[in-house]
A protein has these predicted regions:
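Long, contiguous interaction/recruitment modules in multidomain scaffold/adaptor proteins
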Residues: 1-27, 31
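Flexible helix-coil transition and linker loops at the boundaries of alpha-helical arrays
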Residues: 19-23, 59-65, 99-103, 140-143
Length: 201
């Protein structure tokens, strides 16, 4: 038995024990990002914003584009909750540019949906419509009928907000046609009725 005492700073987890496997614990930007998500889930937007801004700076210093995009996306979400729609759009657009550079199609669509909501909240229905048409093109190209139906419903709503009821009816009839093609008779009839109602308003 030895009388020598091991220095405290030499004591750490046993290699391979799993205690040192979480690299996020060693990355302040990831720690801040994780804390921001926790605050956001509790609707503590001030603390969440502080954490995400700190994470953003850390990710930028590391050159971690994915982290930068994620932080901008979350900060945009906070701005939406605080009804700061212009700021939200700025953050979503920054995330969008990174995702476009990375050819991350799914993230691009998700960000576009958030941008549509921000434009609608700001009353900029023409820009909302332009972005929705891009989303619809994506769903058409990828043969995604569920996604197409979702965005066509949004398009119909915006046309109605703009007072363009005939165009809203066309979008609703397109949805009815999609449902009819998949044998969803009742849903097709429902959308046909909604189209007729939109025309008569």
């Amino acid at each position: 038995m030895s009388d020598r005492i091991q220095p405290l700073d030499a004591i750490g987890p046993v290699p391979g024990s799993g205690q040192d496997s979480d690299e996020a614990l060693n990355d302040p930007a990831k720690v801040d990002y994780k804390a921001g998500r926790e605050y956001l889930s509790k609707k503590d937007y001030v603390q969440a914003a502080v954490c995400f801004h700190n994470a953003l700076r850390g990710f930028e210093e590391q050159g971690n584009d994915q982290g930068v995009a994620n932080a901008h996306d979350r900060i945009g979400d906070i701005c939406m909750e605080r009804e700061e729609f212009g700021k939200a759009l700025d953050h979503y657009q920054r995330a969008f540019e990174i995702c476009r550079k990375e050819s991350d199609i799914f993230s691009l669509v998700a960000l576009n949906k958030k941008k549509v909501l921000a434009y609608r909240k700001m009353g900029d229905l023409n820009l909302a419509m332009a972005v929705m048409m891009d989303i619809l093109d994506h769903y058409t190209e990828t043969r995604n009928p569920k996604g197409s139906v979702e965005v066509l419903e949004m398009i119909a709503e915006v046309y109605r907000e703009k007072g363009e009821n005939l165009k809203a009816a066309d979008a609703l009839r397109t949805i009815a046609g999609i449902h009819r093609n998949f044998g969803h008779k009742r849903k097709a009839e429902d959308f046909d009725k909604r189209a007729l109602k939109a025309e008569q308003e």
